[in-house]
Amino acid sequence: MSNTLFDDIFQVSEVDPGRYNKVCRIEAASTTQDQCKLTLDINVELFPVAAQDSLTVTIASSLNLEDTPANDSSATRSWRPPQAGDRSLADDYDYVMYGTAYKFEEVSKDLIAVYYSFGGLLMRLEGNYRNLNNLKQENAYLLIRR
């Protein structure tokens, strides 16, 4: 699927409830890539997470199941509520957020970090630039399932 920009499985190593009532910051490491790490603010009232949980994390440019045409820019698309019986990528996941990539940072020679904001809930994804090269400074969907 060309709508999928990033997809990996992460093992949660730490859950920090911090000072917010319904939000925790989780730290997770990829089970398939040595240097890929995830830090994510998550609403634990909607999606409870514990240490040692295994999560599939996907970043997608669209929730359409079929590939989006290359000339289909965000200016020409319109949002409409899904019709009864319509399926989307979100149907296969337990927790979905929509946000924007706002910062890219070079961590070391081969590592970069990409920062996203999902309405104030933040995410930092660090990994090899070859694995994160599809991520651009644009809006995207974050999809998570157990």
Swiss-Prot record:
Function according to Swiss-Prot or TrEMBL: DNA-dependent RNA polymerases catalyze the transcription. of DNA into RNA using the four ribonucleoside triphosphates as substrates. Common component of RNA polymerases I, II and III which synthesize ribosomal RNA precursors, mRNA precursors and many functional non-coding RNAs, and small RNAs, such as 5S rRNA and tRNAs, respectively.
Pfam families referenced in this protein's UniProt entry, alphabetically: RNA_pol_Rpb8
Family per similarity comment: Belongs to the eukaryotic RPB8 RNA polymerase subunit family.
Localisation per UniProt entry: Nucleus
Chain segments carrying region Non-specific ssDNA binding: 16-39
PANTHER family: DNA-DIRECTED RNA POLYMERASES I, II, AND III SUBUNIT RPABC3
Residues the record lists as N-acetylserine modifications: 2
Misc: Present with 6210 molecules/cell in log phase SD medium.
Protein name (database record): DNA-directed RNA polymerases I, II, and III subunit RPABC3
Gene Ontology MF terms in the entry: DNA binding; DNA-directed RNA polymerase activity
InterPro entries per record: NA-bd_OB-fold, RPABC3
TM stretches of this protein: none
Subunit structure, interactors included: Component of the RNA polymerase I (Pol I), RNA polymerase II (Pol II) and RNA polymerase III (Pol III) complexes. Component of the RNA polymerase I (Pol I) complex consisting of 14 subunits: RPA135, RPA190, RPC40, RPA14, RPB5, RPO26, RPA43, RPB8, RPA12, RPB10, RPC19, RPC10, RPA49 and RPA34. The complex is composed of a horseshoe-shaped core containing ten subunits (RPA135, RPA190, RPB5, RPO26, RPB8, RPB10, RPC10, RPA12, RPC19 and RPC40) where RPA135 and RPA190 form the DNA-binding cleft.
Positions where Phosphothreonine occurs in the chain: 68
UniProt keywords, alphabetically: Acetylation, DNA-binding, DNA-directed RNA polymerase, Nucleus, Phosphoprotein, Ribosome biogenesis, Transcription
Biological processes annotated in GO: nucleolar large rRNA transcription by RNA polymerase I; ribosome biogenesis; RNA-templated transcription; termination of RNA polymerase I transcription; termination of RNA polymerase III transcription; transcription by RNA polymerase I; transcription by RNA polymerase II; transcription by RNA polymerase III
GO cellular component: nucleoplasm; nucleus; RNA polymerase I complex; RNA polymerase II, core complex; RNA polymerase III complex
